[in-house]
Every structure is written in structure tokens, then in C-alpha cells.
């Protein structure tokens, strides 16, 4: 899983937050969020830490984990 897919997943998990909503919270353009989600750019360390605080996750979760698969596995365990 890529950083971009994880970011998109977290954004939707947080009440279907739009790219525009996230851009406003992060003080960047919507185009920047789009580039992050498409994996054509990555945030600098300060912005990455800010994303982690916003979504209550670790840098490791944000950049390395497959958050979608982890979420699905957790959901399947609860069923």
C-alpha cells in the first residue's frame, strides 16, 4: 500500500473529508493533496507529522502499512 492510498483512506474514514477540507486544515492547496494521494509528491516531515496528529496515526502507519487491508482484517475479526 502506498502513502497516497493510506492518506485517501484516512481522509474518507474521517467523515468523508474532501481534499479541499484537508488542504485547508494542512494549509496547502487542494492540488498538493491530490499529488500526495497520487504518489507524485510526498509531504515534508513537518506536514507528515501534522497529518499523523490529524488522523491519530504513526508515521509508520501512514507511510508503510496497508491501512485498508488492516481495517478489513479488523472488521472481519469482529464479525
Locations of regions flagged by a protein language model:
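DNA major-groove recognition helix of helix-turn-helix/homeodomain DNA-binding modules
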Residues: 46-61
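Short, charged recognition helix plus adjacent turn
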Residues: 65-79
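Alpha-helical residues within helix-turn-helix
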Residues: 9, 20-21, 50
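Alpha-helical residues within the helix-turn-helix
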Residues: 12-13, 24, 53
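Residue-level detection of the helix-turn-helix DNA-binding "recognition helix"
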Residues: 12, 27, 38-40, 64-67
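A short, Lys/Arg-rich alpha-helix, primarily the initiator
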Residues: 1-14
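Short alpha-helical DNA-recognition segment
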Residues: 16-35
